[in-house]
Structures are given as structure tokens and as C-alpha cells.
Amino acid sequence: MRLLVIDGNSIANRAFYCIKLLTTKDGRYTNAIFGFLNIMNSLLRECEPDEVAVAFDLKHPTFRHEMYDGYKGTRHAMPDELAQQMPILKELLTDLGYRQVSAKGWEADDILGTLAAACEARRDDCFLATGDRDSLQLVSETTTVLLATSAMGRSKTETMDLDAIHEKYGIEPKQLIEVKSLMGDTSDNIPGVKGIGEKTAMTLVKNFGTLDSVYDHLDSPIIKPRQRENLLACREDAYLSHTLGTIRTDAPIDTAEGAYKVTEGNKPAAVRLMQELEIQTLITRFGLDGIVPEQDPDTLPEVDAAIASLPAEPSGHYLVAARPAVLGKKSAVVQPEAWYAVQDTTVYPLSEEELVSLLDDPKVTLDVFDSAPLYARAMAAGSWGSSIVWDGKLAAYLLDASASHYLLTTLATSYHARSAFSCEEYPDAGFLADLFAKMKAEITENGEDELYNNIEFPLAQVLADMTRTGILVDRKGIEAFGVQLRQELDQVLTRIEMEAGTSDFNPNSPKQLGTLLFDTMGLPHGKKTKNGWSTDAETLEKLRDIPLVEDILQYRACQKLNSTYVEGLLKVIGEDGRIHTRFNQTEARTGRLSSDNPNLQNIPIRTEMGSKLRAYFVAKPGCVLVDADYSQIELRILAHVTGDAHMQEAFLSGADIHRSTAAKIYNIRPEDVTPRLRSSAKAINFGIMYGKGAYSLSKDIGVSVKEAEAFLQTYLATFPNIDGYMEKTIADARQCGYVSTLFGRRRALPELNSNNHNIRASGERMARNTPIQGTAADVIKLAMVRVWRRLRDEKMESRLILTVHDELIVEAPEAEAEKAAQILREEMEGCVHYAVPLSTDVHTGKNWLEAH
């Protein structure tokens, strides 16, 4: 028999701090629940247990508190954000069929110890999952500790059995109690012996074995005089620490074999709760796909749906959605995706032909869920999908941009949508009408109708057309560039080997590189990780003046260009010679667009080699690329929203904003501003929007933290409206729970009310940045819609084909290039009217590099 015992509080705590705060649409925290269940799922796969117990601490004092008033006296209270999740987590565990165990006056550690001892007595295998190293004392021939640790912000488990304990500590597991009794434990406020740390305690235990033996051999020459004095003075504390640190194995709990068998629980309730918590992916991970969620009695339908064939001549209003595909083992399709239409209480399963026909039927209007694949189908068939008048997925994104996914089942639960009818084959169909109505009402209530109707909804059609059109690339040019990069890599590698003095060296190995640079060569080093010295870009940039480091940075840059961009782009070129990137409209919390397959947002431009890549994105014969880029749009928006006269004056006069800023700060004439001063002003102009403090600014501009702080204070004194605006934005967001763009786009910020300083500071940075960056995103989206419509309305052959950050690219016949440039400038600059007018830089070329 194999028993898995999970230290509930410890793993929940670990999950809470490893995952950034997540909230549902209605503001419930979920990161600890999500992380805990993910860790648990991994443990279940790893251990394949026959029984599972989850141990939790109770709020009552334990026998250790009665023994020592100061026990755990230095611990902070559980954060409210975590405390709110604990009862929900326990409810979910019960619904999933996992038994929880607690004992008044006892800690979860003692429950782990008691269950481990019971397994040992039966010679059964026991796995203890915890983040508390105290449990390592329980390791035995039958007991393995799965120690939860954090690495790079992620939780993982380290398997600690007898061999691992011997290798890591060189002592027996039980002797870890002796070590703790000597060194104490600040986290539990266990005193130990004054002046004895882990290294000394380990030495004493390795030599004498036990605490008793240490005191029996105080005259040993191994024990130094000062240590002897401290041992004598702290004898009582040492033995108290021994008692406090010993995990008991006699807690009053059920230890019978079979007591922790996983039961059926209440799977429908578990599915419903997971949907409410918007952690839909866990439904699949726990094998709950296909289980109909428990329904609120108030939402139970009274009628059954009629399933019928679509009329030969459909008319009126339909709701259209897809039953998602169900995947089995190894991603085998158990049930394919199936689109359907709903009208009143009738469900119409749709063939591909019927679906496409419906999308452009002038006699019907469609409220759909996820218009992107529908527009793609319509455009592939030669139409525009003009029957679509509303998209529930876009509405869901607008109402909660922080969600990790948007699924009908989750949304129906979250909105407590009432089902108009029951339909076993299409279980979500009955909820569509009520769900869509509630989402429409909330958009209106939030004042987001114009944002939805004028920007988000029409943009979906624009993006679908851009994806379908794609951008032409020069395949042979990219292949030749790849050859050039590989030759460059060979040359740089040869130089690296010469400079390193060895060919037995892998520049891709951070460990080998760290050893060479910081141990062998003795260069100034940064932080050290468990795998060796850090060799990240920030560390190496400080050493760029050294030829070897310069070449390593060059090697990394060329390697990334070749693997990520050259090889990556060649894989996704279509049969038409064009790349059809997919634009993601519902991912970024600020409202920004992203793209994938491939990601064209990150095509490098800051290096000479990187910028060359743009030369291989070309116009088709007889055409040119017309590129329009907003000039400093975020700073212009900042000047508008803050009403800062100095910043507005600089923009209105056409001055260089960064030179003007430097002149104001240093009280000098603009013509006296040096490149270094301008660079510093540029860094703070942008840094202020991202909430950067003196430390970050000091790294950006290469000065001390003290100098950066003085620079920052001078800036804020020079532009007082900016600081006042930022502070008011944070205060307002803390009160109402969200920030808004000028178009009314909301972003919830529960982080602002966190008790954790780091989380709260992160929320403040987002509060500063989101209204500016989000407004810029709204502006570029609106401009895209206007440009796309204008090109169509004027019946031009020119096509909007790409957007990257604040940049729009049109592929235009040479005869239309001037007109296309005019349209780009007029629509991009005229889509909003702010105190500081928007400005664009428009250029034309045969390829992207020429046009930019």
C-alpha cells in the first residue's frame, strides 16, 4: 500500500507565493488554490498512491505553544488573500474525494509523523509532501519526503529518501533533530544555543551523534572554549529546542489501513466550483471532462430543447457557438468540435456548409461566441461574415481581461446564467441567451458600449482579414541570412575559444561560462545561484568592454536570431510565400494585441544584424509597403491626461521631448543638452509611466542609486502634475478596485489592497502604467478599424497587413502608395483629439526595413 500525505498549509503557502495573485471576475483570489491543485496533481502522477491524506493545521494553540510561549512568535499572520482561499480549497478537496485530517492541539507535522510511523509499522510506503524541512527527520526505509521548493518563481519537488539525506547532510534523518536543538530555528522561534549556527551544529552532531553526547563530552578538544560556555549557559534552551523540534508520531488521528482511500466525493460539485473559480484547466487535469457540473436549482431548465435541421431559408436572430472538442489520451479526439445555432428553444447542429452560409446571410443576424474562426471561414469562402453582430468571447475579455481563458461553461457558472432548456448533446446551448444578455448589460453598466462597438468588435473582422492576407517574405533571402549567421557564429566561436584559451568549453553552458569568467578569470561577478554564477544578460552587459564577454554576447545574439527567427520563420511560410501570423485579441491585460505562429511583435530592431531581418519582409511585385508609426504616443497621452503645461508645450512646439525634458530638469538651454543628459531624460520619461524607482533608473542610466534618486526628485518637482496624476490614479484604483483607459477599458487590480508589500507595489506599478499603455492600445486598435474601413470604402487594392506595437503596415500598389500613406496619416492622427495631437512617421519601401 502507498500512502501520500500532503502538508496542506505548507503546500498552499508555497503555491500562494509562487504564483502571482489571480482573481475571478467577481474578485475572489484563486492563485493558492490553482497552485495547490497543480502541485497535488503532479504528486498523484508521481506517487500513484493507493490512499491520500491532506493534513491541515488548526487555529488552536498546540502543545508546543503551551510548553513555550514564544513558539512561532515571530511568524506573521496568514495573508488575507491566502486565508480567503483556504476554506474553498478544503471544500474542493472534499468534493474531489480526498480526506482531510486535523487534530486540535497538534500540528500538521505531527499528523505527517503519525501517519508515517503507522506505515512504517505495516512496512507500507509513505510519501510526505511538504515545504517544511523539519519533516526530513521522518525519512526512513519506508518514508520519503517530497520537499516542495521554489526555483525561478516556480514550485517543484525534491525527492528526499535515505540516500539523499546521507548525501546532503552526512547524518541520519533523526539526527536532524539534534542539529536543530543546537542551532535553533528562527522561523519557528526555537532558541537553540546562542552562537551556534548550522555549520557548527552539524560538526558537533557528526562527531558526537546526539545532544546528550555533546553535553557528555564538553571537555572534548573539538568543542571550542566559547562554544563550551554557550552550551553550558543555554543547556535548558537546547533541550527545550530538542523537544519543540521533534515531530511526534502519536497524534490522535485515524491510522488504519484504508482510512484514506479516495472516495467518489461530489465530482459535479467540484466541476461547478472549478468553473466558478475560473480554473477550467484543472477539470481536465483531474480527469473530470464530461462530468456535468452541479447546477444551481434556480437555473435548472423546465423544458427540453428540440434538435432540428437548419431551415432551408433561415431568418431572424440566432445564437451561434461550438461544442468544444473532447480529447482523450495522447490528445486523441474523442468528440470533435461541433458548431450549432440556437433560436428560442431549438438547437440546430450545423454542417460546415450550413455554418459558412449562415455567416453571410442577409436575412439573419448572429450573436456568436468566438468570432475569429468564423470570420476566417467566411473570408475563405469569399464573404465577410457580415451576419455576425456580437461576440460573447470579446465581451468576456472586455469584462475581465485578467482571465486565463474564456470558456462558455466557466462563464455560465460565473454569471449564474439561467438555462432556457436542457440539451444533453449541446449542454451549453441553453445558457447562451441569458449569459449573453447579462454580459451585454454589464458592458453597458460599465460604460464600455462604445469601446466594444467601435473598437473591440469590429477589430475582430480586421484581424481575421490581416491574418488571411499575410505578409510576403523572401524565402531565399532568409535562407542566405541564415547561412551568414551560421558563418558569423563559427567565427565568433573561434574567437571565444582563443580568448578562453581552450576549445573544451561550451559557451551555451551558464555553469561553464560562470566558472571561466568569475573563477578562472576573476572578473567582477553578480549573484550566485545553486548552479553557479549568474551569466544573464544584465550581468554580462556590465562586462561588455572585455573582448571575451563582447564575443559571448554577440554569439548569443546571433544564435537567437538564427534559431528563433531564421529557422522559425522558414517553418511557417505558407504555400503562397506569405506568413500568416495569428493575432491574439483576448490575451493582454492592458488591451494590447499579441501575435503568434510566428510572433512578429518581437522581430529585433536594436542591433544591425537584427534589423536586417526586416529586409526579408517584402511587398509583392508592383507593390510597396507603407509603414506608419505613432511618434511617442504614450508620452503624448501622458501629457494629455496630466495636463502638464511643460510637457504639452514641448510637444505643441515640435521640440524634441527628451531634450526639452533634460533642459527643464537641469535648467539649461536645449542646445546645451548633451547626448548623455538626453538619454537620462528619455529613460525617466518612459520610466515614470512604468513606476520605476531610483534603483531601476540607476541601472538604466548608469549612475548610483543616490544620483538616480536626486534626478527623480528633480523631475517630479519640475513636472508636478505627473506625480499628482500618478498618486491620484493609485488612490482611486485602490478605492474602486480598478483603473481605466480614456476609452473606459477597465483592469482590475486586487494587488493594490494586498498586505504583502511586494504584491502591493506591483499593483501600484500596474495602476500607473495601464491607463497610459491601455489608452495607446485602444488608439492603435481604433486606427486599425478606421484605416481598414477606409481602404475598403474607397475600393482600393491596398491592404492592411500587419501591426507591431504602435506601427501599422499597408501593402499598396505603387499607384496607390501616396493615397495609402495619406489615409494612414489621416486616420491614425485623426481618430482621437487630445490636448497634444497625435503624430505619425510614414515611410514607403520595397521591404519592411526600407519602409520603417
Question: What function would you assign to each model-found segment?
Answer:
Residues 487, 491-494, 498, 502-549, ...:
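C-terminal polymerase-core module
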Residues 234-353, 365, 369, 425, ...:
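Conserved "right-hand" nucleotidyltransferase catalytic core of DNA-directed polymerases
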Residues 23, 73-253:
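Extended two-metal-dependent nuclease catalytic cores across DNA- and RNA-processing enzymes
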Residues 5-6, 128-130, 319-321, 389-390, ...:
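Short hydrophobic beta-strand that contains or immediately precedes a catalytic carboxylate
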Residues 99, 152-180, 332-463, 487, ...:
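Active-site-proximal helix-loop-helix substrate-binding element of RNase H-like nuclease domains
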Residues 345, 393-422, 431, 585-670:
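Function-dense linear segments that define catalytic or interfacial modules
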Residues 3-4, 8, 14-53, 69-70, ...:
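Conserved RNase H-like, two-metal-ion catalytic cores of nucleic-acid enzymes
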Residues 468, 566, 580-581, 585-588, ...:
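Conserved catalytic core of nucleic-acid polymerases
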